[in-house]
């Protein structure tokens, strides 16, 4: 959890906590600006979404193929670039990295990617065409 908490702005530490009465497991978040920790119900949706993506790729046995639809929805714009970098590092930087497929309509997510990472799926009459941006438009 230390690696993950370092990658989420505003979070100093993430700790698991088990409620002794209900036996439920919770996450407690510590931030330098707050004396007491807070739980996931007090976190923003975007922060929780970023946490979920990071948990997905930091799994010791990640899925070989990961599909994410519009990961930028609900994320603070400055986190999008950080998320793209984390996904790229996961897919290319380690053994057993996943192949990652992302869909988006947002230019700022595409801007965070390398041209060779971007593919366009275009509907043409009764057919579809798939183009790599690097090959189709830049060469």
Residues of each region from the PLM?
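Secondary-structure boundary motif
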Residues: 6, 59, 89-93
